[in-house]
């Protein structure tokens, strides 16, 4: 099995040896397959953001290792720099980090730092703007003239323009309306499919993660406490409740229907799955009541 990213006994301690010492992540063994769409969930302060900042070398472990394609990302300064182009990280509310005079220049910032030619930079800006759902006419505007959703897309385009093998997003749809959230998720999927990219998404939106990811990792107090498919994770309603997390609403409705005697499987976690199961059950229930 090909793992593009892997951690080995990864630990990070903030302010070690002081009264403020805090173990953010502890002894994490974690791996992501090439092309996988991974969701990371957990309560606030569980270690999610600390983990993802290690995955592109932004933070250095207190102990342990992070590997990209089998090589320790801190094996040399040059490789650590390369990793930051290969593993793109979009922070929460990335629109607050826009700073250039035009949207074009903001998106071009990463490719320029990669020392690409002017023509290649232009090609990448236009391509990434397309993936992010930005019209060409917006590229010459100041980023501060854009709407909130457009700023978010411009910030994501700036990371996509580096064509990362791994795209990591921290709450990419936070604060957006439903249409804006759907658009961002579609944009991310378009990039993933076009470049066979690996996507890692941190989110509190359980409906979103249930619909889109291949696998979920659940963090609690700096440790991984659950790792599996969305169906596996969201069928453990009692465990999620104990961890202070809400399951997708469809999972909760399905559980109530099962309690009333309806034979729904435990892995119903999306509206589409619920519709399919209810259609299958309708003839049986009709025959039973005839």
Question: Where are each of the predicted segments found?
Answer:
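Conserved ABC ATPase "signature" C-loop
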Residues: 221-222
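Conserved ABC ATPase "signature" region
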Residues: 119-137
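Catalytic Walker B motif of ABC-type/P-loop ATPase nucleotide-binding domains
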Residues: 167-170
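Helix-to-loop junction immediately C-terminal to a conserved catalytic motif
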Residues: 56
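ABC ATPase NBD Q-loop/coupling interface
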Residues: 65-82
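Conserved ABC ATPase signature
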Residues: 142-146, 150
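Conserved catalytic motifs of ABC-family nucleotide-binding domains
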Residues: 163
């Amino acid at each position: 099995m090909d793992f593009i990213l892997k951690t080995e006994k990864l630990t990070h301690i903030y302010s070690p040896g002081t009264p403020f010492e805090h173990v953010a992540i502890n002894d994490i063994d974690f791996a992501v397959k090439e092309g996988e769409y991974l969701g990371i969930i957990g309560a606030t302060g569980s270690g999610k953001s600390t983990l993802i900042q290690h995955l592109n070398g932004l933070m250095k472990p207190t102990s342990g290792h992070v590997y990209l394609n089998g090589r320790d990302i801190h094996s040399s300064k040059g490789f650590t720099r390369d990793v930051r182009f290969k593993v793109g990280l979009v922070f929460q509310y990335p629109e607050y980090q826009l700073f250039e005079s035009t949207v074009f220049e903001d998106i071009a910032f990463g490719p320029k730092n990669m020392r690409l030619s002017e023509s290649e930079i232009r090609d990448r800006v236009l391509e990434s703007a397309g993936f992010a759902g930005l019209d060409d006419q917006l590229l010459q505007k100041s980023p501060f003239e854009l709407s909130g959703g457009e700023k978010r897309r411009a910030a994501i385009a700036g990371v996509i323009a580096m064509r990362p093998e791994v795209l990591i997003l921290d709450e990419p749809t936070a604060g957006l309306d439903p249409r804006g959230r759907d658009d961002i998720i579609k944009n991310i999927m378009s990039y993933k499919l076009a470049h066979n990219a690996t996507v890692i998404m941190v989110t509190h939106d359980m409906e979103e993660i249930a619909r889109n990811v291949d696998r979920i990792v659940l963090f609690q107090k700096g440790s991984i406490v659950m790792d599996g498919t969305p169906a596996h994770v969201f069928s453990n309603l009692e465990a999620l409740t104990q961890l202070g997390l809400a399951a997708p609403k469809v999972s909760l409705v399905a559980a109530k229907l099962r309690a009333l005697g309806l034979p729904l499987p435990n892995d119903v976690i999306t509206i589409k799955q619920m519709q399919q199961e209810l259609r299958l059950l309708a003839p049986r229930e009709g025959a039973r009541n005839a």
